[in-house]
């Protein structure tokens, strides 16, 4: 596990080189939560209702905006307003995976207008380094307008059974993150990757990549489609800074109560990890 994982969110925020990661750690500390809720619902009303009800207990809301049947300006403006009201970030789980020219248009153009409202996006590096370079280039362009309020997570590992996001793929994810560290704030992975070394790159004292771990569920070990779950304690024990929970929260009989339970367990696991630091 990365030595930075042993530090408090406050300590990491105070020295973090990435402005959005700094803000995220500050939100987590202020609200005492490391929960990201994956709001995989299919209407704007459901999404905004969940965001409003769960907002006080989460650090991030994760969307799959293209599964909404009625995406519109109301969706964008509603999400932005609730993010401000409840002090959380928005993570669009678009998983960009195409040539650079295409992903630039998908991110900063098109009907979904992702760059306008999503603080965090993610990508797979299967197309190669160019996808990370292209997204970073877009975010640093003079006419971008959102600057340090946007960041990228590289999908370095997945929790689904038989995932091919392993080995050299994961190592290259870390290499690209180090090269484009001004825009890449961290990874979606099952563990801390800060100690990964290769012929291309090695850890530096100042780097502090944020780790989001998916597939966190208190009451289930998996589903029929290959998803493999772990608990908040096991995820954070392996190096997760933020836990991503979907059905365990939004499909619960009482989503608010479920979010509070994940908040409690996630925060206790974080406190246990940092000890007296």
From Swiss-Prot:
Q: Which terms in the Gene Ontology molecular function aspect does this entry carry?
A: orotidine-5'-phosphate decarboxylase activity
Q: Does the keyword GTP-binding apply?
A: no
Pathway this chain belongs to: Pyrimidine metabolism; UMP biosynthesis via de novo pathway; UMP from orotate: step 2/2
**Gene Ontology biological process terms, A to Z:** 'de novo' pyrimidine nucleobase biosynthetic process; 'de novo' UMP biosynthetic process
- Residues at which substrate binds: 40, 62-64, 93-102, 229, 247
An example Pfam family from this entry, by short name, is OMPdecase
Q: What EC number(s) does the entry state?
A: 4.1.1.23
Question: What do the Gene Ontology cellular component annotations say?
Answer: cytosol
- The broad enzyme category this protein falls into is lyase
Q: Give the matching InterPro entries.
A: Aldolase_TIM, OMPdecase, OMPdecase_AS, OMPdeCOase_dom, RibuloseP-bd_barrel
Q: Which reaction is recorded as catalysed by this protein? A: orotidine 5'-phosphate + H(+) = UMP + CO2
SMART domains from the xrefs?
OMPdecase (SM00934)
Q: Does the keyword Lyase apply?
A: yes
According to its UniProt record, which protein family does this protein belong to? Belongs to the OMP decarboxylase family.
Listed name of the protein: Orotidine 5'-phosphate decarboxylase
């Amino acid at each position: 596990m990365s030595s930075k994982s042993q530090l408090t969110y406050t300590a990491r925020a105070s020295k973090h080189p990435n402005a959005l990661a700094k803000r995220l750690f500050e939100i987590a500390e202020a609200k005492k939560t490391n929960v990201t809720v994956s709001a995989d619902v299919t209407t704007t009303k459901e999404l905004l209702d969940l965001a409003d009800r769960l907002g006080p207990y989460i650090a991030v809301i994760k969307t799959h905006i293209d599964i909404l049947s009625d995406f519109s300006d109301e969706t964008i403006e509603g999400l932005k307003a609730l993010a401000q009201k409840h002090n959380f970030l928005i993570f669009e789980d678009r998983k960009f995976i195409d040539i650079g020219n295409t992903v630039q248009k998908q991110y900063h153009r098109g009907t979904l207008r992702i760059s306008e409202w999503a603080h965090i996006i993610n990508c797979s590096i299967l197309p190669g380094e160019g996808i990370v370079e292209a997204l970073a280039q877009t975010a640093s362009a003079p006419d971008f307008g959102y600057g340090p309020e946007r960041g990228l997570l590289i999908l370095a590992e997945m929790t689904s059974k038989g995932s091919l996001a392993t080995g050299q793929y994961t190592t290259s994810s870390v290499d690209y993150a180090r090269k484009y560290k001004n825009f890449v704030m961290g990874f979606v992975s099952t563990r801390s990757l800060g100690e990964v070394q290769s012929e291309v790159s090695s850890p530096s004292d100042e780097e502090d990549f944020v780790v989001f771990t998916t597939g966190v569920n208190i009451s289930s070990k998996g589903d029929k489609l290959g998803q493999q779950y772990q608990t908040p304690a096991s995820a954070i024990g392996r190096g997760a800074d933020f836990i991503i929970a979907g059905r365990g929260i939004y499909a619960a009989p009482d989503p608010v109560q479920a979010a509070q339970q994940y908040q409690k367990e996630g925060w206790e696991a974080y406190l246990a990890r940092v000890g007296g630091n």
